[in-house]
């Protein structure tokens, strides 16, 4: 099987891959990202790869990472950053509440838990605009 990248005639050496090299894999991702209008790069520092875009029948899914070996590292870094942001928000709320409300000795601040985004590996789904869904036919008079 030959490489699926336009203009390449090299043979694919790894079973299950679509491209002949890792450089051509990133170029293929760039072509797919340009096709659907995504300009985002991988969330990992110093990666430089384009994010993983999977095109379905009527939608396309855009992931936060390129899907290479550092996906778990990206997820942990995002979760740590989200935890720090929520700690800052809770601290600021606590400071505002203590400054504006006079508390009695028996009252305790509520320990409300905020939901963190746990679906890092799940994509954002968008509708494709190049496939007719038939909705426009409903409004033809």
Swiss-Prot record:
For the region Disordered, what residue ranges are annotated? Answer: 97-119
User: Composition bias, kind Basic residues: at what positions?
Assistant: 102-115
Pfam families in the record, alphabetically?
DUF728
Q: What is the superkingdom listed in this entry's lineage?
A: Viruses
Instruction: Please state what the protein is called.
Output: 16 kDa protein
Organism lineage: Viruses, Riboviria, Orthornavirae, Kitrinoviricota, Alsuviricetes
């Amino acid at each position: 099987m030959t490489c699926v990248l336009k203009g390449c005639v090299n043979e694919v050496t790894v079973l299950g891959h679509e491209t002949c090299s890792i450089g051509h894999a990133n170029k293929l991702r760039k072509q797919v990202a340009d096709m659907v209008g995504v300009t985002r790069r991988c969330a990992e520092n110093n990666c430089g790869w384009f994010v993983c875009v999977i095109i379905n029948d009527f939608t396309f899914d855009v992931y936060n990472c390129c899907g290479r070996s550092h996906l778990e590292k990206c997820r942990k870094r995002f979760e740590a950053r989200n935890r720090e942001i929520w700690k800052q928000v809770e601290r600021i709320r606590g400071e505002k509440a203590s400054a504006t409300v006079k508390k009695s000795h028996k009252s305790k601040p509520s320990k409300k838990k905020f939901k963190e985004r746990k679906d890092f590996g799940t994509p954002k789904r968008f509708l494709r605009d190049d496939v007719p869904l038939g909705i426009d036919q409903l409004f033809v008079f």
